Amino acid sequence: MRRIVVAAVLLAVLTARAQDTRFCGPPARDADGAIARSSAERARFQRLYPCPANGARRGACPGWAVDHVVPLACGGCDAVPNMQWLPTGSKSTTSPLAKDRWERAVYCTHGVAS
């Protein structure tokens, strides 16, 4: 019975993930092996969702960073639907409960390596 429940939960997670447009698969990498990011997509995000600090639709946004909801290293898309504004303090904390650590624990579970 327990195996059936576990299988059903796993199937539900995989199905939900397959339908989630924030997932794109393994990330593109540049010549140095770093994950490639699109400056055009980031600019598009900021035009659609201005900086929370100063309302700027381009340029600097003091105290805020563009964050990927599903990390690129975990198969997340480098696209507007997978981006959000996040206070820089939330991204730079060393806590084991930091957003990036939590996201990797949740999203990096299906074979997409960082």
Model-assigned labels for residue ranges:
Residues 1-65, 70-114:
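Nuclease and nuclease-like effector domains acting on nucleic acids or nucleotide cofactors
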